[in-house]
């Protein structure tokens, strides 16, 4: 978002109010409630157990944002809310996304007081820092909701990869860090000869199995629980796919080299930094948040990935750019 005038500056400084109002509406299910039946302010206040006066101002704020509209029967979702929220992802996935942003918010509170800290900002604020993966290891519920959310969000990406990848000679696929198996399931629909093994943490695998059971290709996809950085990986694969995993090292690539059959391919899909200490535009938001945890954090570049692949024994094949900016790097054993 680029600011062009003084009013934009004022709006940006107060944007946390609108963001919080929207996130609350999503987490409490307001748009879905109003889609079932229009309600006036007292009706919303009663349904969601919100003090009436506060609720009225909240609804007025959402109305000013163009997210709800008012008619004689009460408030209802606007056309924008219907097309951008109700008709896109499930209520559960939207609620997870809104909650995730809310949980990130404390990191940037009082940023002016803590941005000079030489270490993690949350520690200076007296808050705990826990990685995404650790939170999912400790909470099957969170892992399940996260996995279902990414399954919905990554449908376009799965379609793009199914169109791009040449699967000639590929019968056994390892989907490393594949979560729900969203990309695998798309490939399995297209290629009846293909089988896939998704490798991820146990709680994610549990959620993935549930999602896979809803598909006709369920018999051709399995889930292997493992910490792929520290544990051995299964072998004899024709292709390993590493899509939006975000963690790379030469040591990991050597393990993947060993897991592939001779002539097998490794396919890496991600937003990479265009240069050292320059964030990918698609990842600028997250890169900044990561720097609040680790002030020396830096995104890896495609050139660094390719160098690690070469050092691990791979032969580089191709580099493609998907709509949205993700790079697809392919290498052969």
Range-by-range predicted roles:
Residues 1-63, 172, 180-185, 189-333:
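Alpha-helical subdomain
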Residues 8, 12-16, 22-24, 32-33, ...:
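Conserved Class I S-adenosyl-L-methionine-dependent methyltransferase catalytic core
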Residues 176:
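Conserved beta-strand/loop positions that form the S-adenosyl-L-methionine
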């Amino acid at each position: 978002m680029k600011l062009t005038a003084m009013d934009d500056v004022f709006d940006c400084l107060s944007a946390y109010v609108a963001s919080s109002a929207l996130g609350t509406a999503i987490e409490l299910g307001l748009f879905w409630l109003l889609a079932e039946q229009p309600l006036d302010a007292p009706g919303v206040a009663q349904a969601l157990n919100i003090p009436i006066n506060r609720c009225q101002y909240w609804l007025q704020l959402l109305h000013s944002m163009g997210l709800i509209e008012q008619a004689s029967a009460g408030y209802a979702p606007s056309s924008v809310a219907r097309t951008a929220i109700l008709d896109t992802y499930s209520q559960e996935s939207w609620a997870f996304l809104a909650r995730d942003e809310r949980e990130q918010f404390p990191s940037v509170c009082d940023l002016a007081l803590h941005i000079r800290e030489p270490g993690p900002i949350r520690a200076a604020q007296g808050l705990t820092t826990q990685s995404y993966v650790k939170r999912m290891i400790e909470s099957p519920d969170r892992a399940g909701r996260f996995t279902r959310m990414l399954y919905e969000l990554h449908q376009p990406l799965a379609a793009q990869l199914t169109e791009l990848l040449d699967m000639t000679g590929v019968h056994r696929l390892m989907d490393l860090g594949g979560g729900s198996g969203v990309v695998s399931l798309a490939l399995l629909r297209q290629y009846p000869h293909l089988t896939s093994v998704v490798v991820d943490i146990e709680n994610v695998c549990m959620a993935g199995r549930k999602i896979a059971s809803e598909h006709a290709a369920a018999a051709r996809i399995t889930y292997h629980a493992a910490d792929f950085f520290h544990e051995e990986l299964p072998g004899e694969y024709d292709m390993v796919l590493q899509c939006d995993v975000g963690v790379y090292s030469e040591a990991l690539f050597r393990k993947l080299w060993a897991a592939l059959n001779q002539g097998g391919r490794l396919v890496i899909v991600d937003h990479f930094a265009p240069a050292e200490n320059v964030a990918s535009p698609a990842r600028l938001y997250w890169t900044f948040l990561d720097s609040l945890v680790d002030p020396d954090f830096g995104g890896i570049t495609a050139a660094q990935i390719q160098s690690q692949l070469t050092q691990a024994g791979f032969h580089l094949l191709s580099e493609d750019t998907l709509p949205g900016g993700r790079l697809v790097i392919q290498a052969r054993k």
